[in-house]
Structure formats: C-alpha cells, structure tokens
Amino acid sequence: MSLRVVYLGTPQFAATVLKTLLDAHTHIVGVVTRADKPQKRSSKLISSPVKQLALSKNIPLLQPIKTTDPAFLAQLREWQADVFIVVAYGVILKQELLDIPTYGCYNLHAGLLPAYRGAAPIQRCIMDGGVLSGNTVIRMDAGMDTGDIANVNYVAIGEDMTAGGLAEALAASGGELLLKTLQEIEAGTVRHVPQNEAMATLAPKLTKEEGGIHWDAPASQVYAHIRGVSPAPGAWTRYLSQGKEARRLGVLSARMESFSGNYGDPGEVLGVSGEDLLIACRQGALRLRMVQPEGKASMKAKDFFNGQSRLVSKLF
C-alpha cells in the first residue's frame, strides 16, 4: 500500500489498531497522540500506549497541547499525508485540520453509528442490554461522529462480556476494517453513505457516579450495568458498616443467579452461596464474586461479608 498515512490516537484501543496497520506494512509517516499525563498520586508523566508503540517503531511523533496550534498544523502539512486515520484520539478536530490530507480524515468508531455517538459507545451499549456491537469507519466532518459511513463490521456481545472485553474484541477487528477501507481509498472504490439522523443516539463519557448500582431493577439489568462500567469507571454500591456508617463497596465482578424468581427486597444480602455473595434484585438475584471495600484492597465477596461478622444485611 502506497498511501501516506498519519495516525491520531491515544489509549490501548488505538495502539492495538495501530499495530495491526503496522503489521500489514501500512505506510505510517507520522503519529499524533495526546500529551503525557501525570501518574495518579505522583508527578511522574505517563506516555500513552500509542506513543510507546510509535517510539518503538521510530515513527515521527507529535504531541500538541492544542490541535489548532499553527506550528502543529504546519508540521502535519509537511508530512504530505494522503489520509489521516483517527482512533480514540480524544479531541474533536476542527475543519482546518480535517482538510489537510488529500483524501480526508477517517475515524474508527467503536459502535454502530448513528447509534451511540460520543465517547462511551462500548460501555453504554452493554449498559443498555445490547447484544450486538461493531465498528464503524466514517469520513470525518466537523461534527461529533456525524460523518458519512465508509465501512462497518459486527461483533456479538457475549452474555458475560464486560466493556473491557468488548473493547478488546472491537480493537482486534477494527484494524482489519481500517485496512479494508485504506485499500478501497487507494483503489478509488470507497463508498460514503450518509448517516440516518433519525436513528442517532448519544453516548457521553461516563461519570464515576454513573457506576452506582440500582438494585430495584431486574437482575439482568443490574448485571448489564455492572458489565458496562467494568473496568471503568467501575460499579459500586453502599453498605452500613458495623458502626452504622454508610460506606462504598466497589463491585469488581459478578454473575447471574440461574433462578429468576423473587428472592427478597432489592439489595437484600441473602448470604454466602458457594464462593459468592447472593444479592436480591427486584426480579432475580446476582452473585457478587470480587469486591473492593472503600480504602481497601480487592477481595472475594464472601470474605468481605465474613469480615463484617455477617452483619451487612442490605446494599443500597
């Protein structure tokens, strides 16, 4: 492939896709990623996974503070790219930048557009109980995920799949979809289909508070919520400690109880069942497997319960 490609991306998802392109000998003439960020509880700067991969391959790298900076835009022009590929870069790009490459900018979106436009298509699809996701490649315009569709693929959402697991599956197949798109661009056969605006939905970035579990819902819905916010921002609930103080409890993993009948009041702690802690929902129940009490390390849910002298009777 002779196309000159500039790649814009930041997290591990984008690094996985970039590796697929590099393994296929795509001509990546430059990489753009977000500026290094301080590590939590430390002043040490952390490089993005995309930066680490680009440096390991000796690919020219830019980390602009602002993508509207004239010096940055001038450097992009010097790379004389035929196409820009954007994957989870993390910044909405202005039209001046989008107009630089000969054939435009193409974005790999981890969702089936026009549904789930925004920063959290993977998480919100699972939280909504979705059973099918996929990648969409669009030719970018100045809107948020509103460009014409060039290619789509599909990935089934397993009944126990978390957002982290779906992200891995979408990244693995997304690189191949981009390779197909680049080949079509080079051959002049790529199609651009406008999105159906009537079908558009939004998927804004999740907040930590949205990880809160509402037990007054069917177990299937609660389980979808937990899977959708795993690993980030993470599911959580509250309990009354022995001193009757409300504390937060992170829920790291869970599974559905097979019987779907009524067990008790929503959030009621039904006790230890095997290795799990059984919690009643409005309909059915969930088995909590791994939890993380506030300010403590992760542990088995049954060990948490036993450590509280089995005095925790309800989660809320």
From Swiss-Prot:
Entries under CDD domains matching the protein: FMT_core_Met-tRNA-FMT_N, Met_tRNA_FMT_C
Annotated binding of (6S)-5,6,7,8-tetrahydrofolate, by residue: 111-114
SUPFAM superfamilies per UniProt: FMT C-terminal domain-like, Formyltransferase
Record-listed E.C. numbers: 2.1.2.9
HAMAP family per UniProt: Formyl_trans
Reaction(s) the record says it catalyses: L-methionyl-tRNA(fMet) + (6R)-10-formyltetrahydrofolate = N-formyl-L-methionyl-tRNA(fMet) + (6S)-5,6,7,8-tetrahydrofolate + H(+)
Pfam families named among the record's database cross-references: Formyl_trans_C (PF02911), Formyl_trans_N (PF00551)
Cellular component annotations (GO), alphabetically ordered: cytosol
Broad EC category: transferase
GO function term, MF aspect, one: methionyl-tRNA formyltransferase activity
PANTHER family, alphabetized: METHIONYL-TRNA FORMYLTRANSFERASE (PTHR11138), METHIONYL-TRNA FORMYLTRANSFERASE, MITOCHONDRIAL (PTHR11138:SF5)
Transferase listed as a keyword: yes
Protein name in the entry: Methionyl-tRNA formyltransferase
Keywords assigned: Protein biosynthesis, Transferase
Name of encoding gene: fmt
Membership in a protein family: Belongs to the Fmt family.
